[in-house]
Amino acid sequence: MSFASVYPLYVAKAEKKGRSKAEVDEIIRWLTGYSQKALEAQLKKKTDFETFFAEAPQLNSSRALIKGVVCGVRVEDIKEPTMQEIRYLDKLIDELAKGKAMEKILRT
């Protein structure tokens, strides 16, 4: 599955709850280390999730602080690395949609 096919769903989920595309992008940049320009290039290339995370310039070390349940599974217990990164991102977008402050979402 391509990251580009899921990205609009992340944005729609956030916007439906009064949040912005810019906040979604900020979360993705925080998690992966991509610049805005590099993020847009990945979207344009329709990169799959595995490549998207494998090519991430600097996966944020604080992502290990992300805890909780997504789709009935605890993100910290997921063993497959790519799936865990996807679920980390899902969890951050869920927190955004639930109205959490960006400072809390970004674990600062």
Task: For each feature predicted by the language model, list its residue ranges.
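A charge-rich, low-complexity, intrinsically flexible signal that marks solvent-exposed coils, linkers
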Residues: M1-T108
